[in-house]
């Protein structure tokens, strides 16, 4: 019983330490971290379970590292003039001296952990445009219109969004995997001229107690500093799932911070759009779901969109397909997602490679030169043993520069269709439809 009390005491003190750490009372936080380490060490001494020992050791190392970081920061601060720790502009001394400070000096005054978080979040800003245009997204016409309404129009025509007409602040894209939710986000990043943050759960969740909610707060602070920002959160259910008795304190704190920031309590959230994607919308916390004013179902593509997807994925790869072939493939792939069609085409594109690999006979043909299509040159290509021009050989006998690979045919696609199956079943789709009827709207 004694060792349990030691551990409970250590946890109690380290929670106080993280609270002081969050409040930027670093001296008190350092003292409490050191005190908690003494209790953790004592608990470790009396712990009999090897598994529990390993957990305690890992936590002890984490809090020791944080204590050392704080000590290093406090030692440096002793040699500097008083400043607002973390750049708090409301501090009178910080305001008096802040006017002439450079960005470099601000970085030096910032707590090392705050600076580290800032740098980490800065890497999530999309600086290179993904080069995905609206037209590159097959189908999803309604979803694209909603996103233009929420993102493009408020930036291009700000005079239209005054008074009671406000742009949407939260949009949730949900649907089966591989239907284009993240691809739509790339199109938004390409089309807008404002700052685009692309966040995944790994950018937010850290091993440090109290650090994750700090990252959430800092993310929104950075977004407010930039004029007109979009925060895209992929797999948002990993961060904001329904609350239950089994979830950790850290997960609960992350959700609470998201709710505070998305609600704009005590902060101006104008000019920030939170765009999120999830495959399991029913798993989201109810309060988080309410923050997303628009909940758009990104369902499976319709036949016209599927035909366009086949064309996009095949692209410039040599092929013999015509419009009727694309329509036939679209009709045969009912229930396939965009990702499934991508996998199917990828397999079909490999069929000519397999034909070369398995061929026992090749023939000589005349075809436009790769270097200069206006010039005809001799190549060899696989053929059936019964072809009048067939010569018995394998791919090992061929000069690589003389090989002419077969073009992709409708037969290749049909062959791959027998192998590549859809990844979503009817039961899954029924659940999405039920959620859409209750809480969302169709984006197709």
From Swiss-Prot:
Function of the protein: Involved in intracellular protein transport probably out of a prevacuolar endosomal compartment. May be involved in the release of components of the bilayered coat from the endosomal membrane. The association with ESCRT-III complex mediates the ATP-dependent disassembly of the ESCRT-III complex.
Cellular component GO terms held in the UniProt record: endolysosome; endosome; endosome membrane; pathogen-containing vacuole; plasma membrane
Gene Ontology biological-process entries: endosomal transport; protein transport; response to bacterium; response to wounding; vacuole organization
Domain remark in the UniProt entry: The MIT domain may serve as an adapter for the ESCRT-III complex.
Name this protein carries in UniProt: Vacuolar protein sorting-associated protein 4
Membrane topology reported for the UniProt record: Peripheral membrane protein
Primary localization class, coarse: membrane
CDD domains: MIT_VPS4 (cd02678), RecA-like_VPS4 (cd19521)
Species of origin: Dictyostelium discoideum (Social amoeba)
Residue positions binding ATP: 175-182
């Amino acid at each position: 019983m004694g060792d349990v009390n030691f551990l409970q005491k250590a946890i109690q003190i380290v929670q106080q330490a993280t609270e002081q750490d969050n409040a930027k009372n670093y001296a008190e936080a350092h003292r409490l971290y050191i005190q908690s380490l003494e209790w953790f060490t004592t608990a470790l001494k009396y712990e009999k379970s090897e598994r529990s020992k390993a957990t305690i050791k890992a936590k002890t190392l984490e809090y020791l590292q944080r204590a050392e970081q704080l000590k290093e920061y406090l030692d440096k601060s002793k040699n500097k003039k008083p400043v607002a720790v973390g750049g708090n502009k409301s501090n009178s001394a910080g305001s008096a001296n802040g006017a002439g400070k450079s960005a470099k000096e601000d970085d030096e005054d910032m707590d090392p952990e705050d600076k580290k978080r800032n740098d980490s979040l800065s890497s999530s800003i999309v600086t290179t445009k993904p080069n995905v245009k609206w037209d590159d997204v097959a189908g999803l016409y309604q979803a694209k219109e909603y996103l233009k309404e929420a993102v493009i129009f408020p930036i291009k025509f700000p005079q239209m969004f005054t008074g009671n007409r406000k742009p949407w602040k939260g949009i949730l894209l949900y649907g089966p995997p591989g239907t284009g939710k993240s691809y739509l986000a790339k199109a938004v990043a390409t089309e807008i001229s404002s700052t685009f943050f692309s966040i995944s759960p790994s950018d937010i969740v850290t091993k440090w107690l109290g650090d994750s909610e700090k990252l959430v707060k800092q993310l929104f602070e950075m977004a407010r500093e930039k004029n007109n920002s979009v925060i895209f959160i992929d797999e948002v259910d990993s961060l904001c799932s329904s609350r239950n008795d089994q979830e950790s304190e850290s997960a609960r704190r992350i959700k609470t911070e998201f709710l505070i920031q998305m609600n704009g309590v005590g902060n101006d959230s104008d000019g920030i759009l939170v765009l999120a994607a999830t495959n399991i919308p029913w798993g989201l916390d109810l309060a988080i779901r309410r923050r997303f004013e628009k909940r758009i179902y990104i369902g499976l593509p319709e036949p016209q969109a599927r035909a366009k997807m086949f064309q996009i994925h095949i692209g410039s790869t040599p092929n013999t397909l015509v419009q009727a072939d694309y329509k036939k493939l679209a009709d045969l792939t009912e229930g396939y997602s965009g990702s499934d069609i991508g996998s199917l085409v990828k397999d079909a594109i490999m069929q000519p490679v397999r034909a070369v690999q398995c061929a026992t006979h090749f023939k000589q043909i005349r075809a436009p030169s790769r270097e200069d299509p206006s010039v005809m040159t001799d190549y060899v290509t696989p053929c059936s043993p019964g072809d009048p021009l067939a010569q018995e050989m394998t791919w090992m006998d061929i000069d690589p520069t003389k090989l002419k690979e077969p073009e992709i045919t409708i037969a290749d696609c049909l062959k791959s269709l027998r192998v590549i199956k859809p990844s979503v079943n009817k039961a899954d789709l029924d659940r999405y439809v039920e959620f859409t009827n209750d809480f969302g709207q169709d984006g197709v």
